[in-house]
Amino acid sequence: RIYHRTGFECGWRYGNVEKENSMKRRVVVTGLGAVTPVGNTVEEFWSSVREGKVGIGPITKFDTSEYKVKLAAEVKGFSAKERMDFKAAKRMEPFAQYAVAAAKEAFEDAKIDMSQENPYRAGVIVGSGIGSLQAVETNYEKILQKGPSRVNPLMVPLMISNMAAGNVSIQLGFKGKCTSVVTACASGTHCIGDGFRAIAYGDLDLCVAGGAESCICPSGVAGFTALTALSDSEDPEKASIPFDKDRNGFVLGEGAGIVMLEELEHAKKRGARIYAEVVGYGATGDAYHITSPAENGEGAGMAMKLAMEEAGAQPEQIDYINAHGTSTHHNDLYETRAIRYALGAAADQVVVNSTKSIIGHLLGAAGGVEFVTCVKSIQDGFIHQTMGTKETEEECSLDYAIGAPVEKEITYALTNSLGFGGHNASLLLKKYEG
């Protein structure tokens, strides 16, 4: 395979970075929302993370007796009618319900008063990698059993992935830019990155951004199993073990992670609490393979470099990386190479972990929840342990927070997402210092 020289090796940059940055507005995080396998609010989620609770267990959503894979990371005890208008919720599939619940939490956390806001300056960028496989399954069964005339008239709007963003917009009354990025497992991170850009360059003042997913269902589990992507371990403590020498696939998870992004001066004017600042975003394509990341890590590494370049941050300034870390053989090895490609010698000084060791792989929602994890880590000076991981292989040789969490002051945190098709996204957060 031929690998072309990268832009950094050739000595060029994407545009006039100094000029572009001088025109940008600063973007901060003022609200957090999450629905996860270890808690249905940010408070519940973060408490579980700090306690080292793992949200993986036997699949309860359908009979797995004929399935090789028995475990998943399901959302537990979620009640849509307690989180949103119940009539509206009945016209949403679970992924959209999770999105609305997390978005409302972020909105309320940010204490936005829409009577004081221009709704056309408030946007929604929320993605889902898949949308609803369940709606397809249910209605296909109706076609087989009762004929095509019995299909639910709402099948299409229930199924399509952009309805996460659509329903959030409807429920919050946000009338500005409303889009949905679909880049498989990088969807949530791309959405937050696009929200960051929309505010930085003046399209919006407020943006709820992130991802939502729910596809723990027969076709979802069967499809990923056929791809040999899922772990077939029946021990919840040993199923999702990123970077471990015995890893054998990811654990399918579900949920949503959505944040409120806001232009700094807008946030200060209304006296908002500021959690952190978003200072860099990098997005690249591997142009390599439909499921595997590039073996040399160049594409993902370049995304990290671009995020750092935008922020004017040096590799040695990065304190923490929340890795994509799926627990598949290829991803974890190639992402390790990507981190070394991006950070060089400084890679040996950074702490890396994988939240998927706790909540499994939330696909399009993963980046949103992992962004929330980075914000809370910066806030608390706490990097959670990569749960279950005991011993790494030779080339996976970074500090993966194995065996215990790490107490550390964090100024800069990177979060990575890699999606099928070669989609790479990295976001750089910074501790807010005024």
Range-by-range predicted roles:
Residues 18-88, 110, 265-277, 372-386, ...:
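ACP-dependent fatty acid/polyketide chain-elongation machinery
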Residues 43-48, 134-148, 198-201, 221-234, ...:
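A glycine- and small-aliphatic-rich helix-loop capping segment at beta-alpha/alpha-beta transitions
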Residues 26-30, 57, 235-311, 320, ...:
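Condensing-enzyme catalytic core mediating Claisen C-C bond formation in acyl metabolism
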Residues 203-248, 281-295, 325-332, 349-399:
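Acyl-CoA/ACP chain-elongation machinery
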Residues 99-112, 161-165, 169-213, 251-272, ...:
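Active-site-proximal alpha-helical scaffold in enzymes
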Residues 29, 45-46, 50-183, 212-221, ...:
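Conserved beta-ketoacyl condensing-enzyme motif
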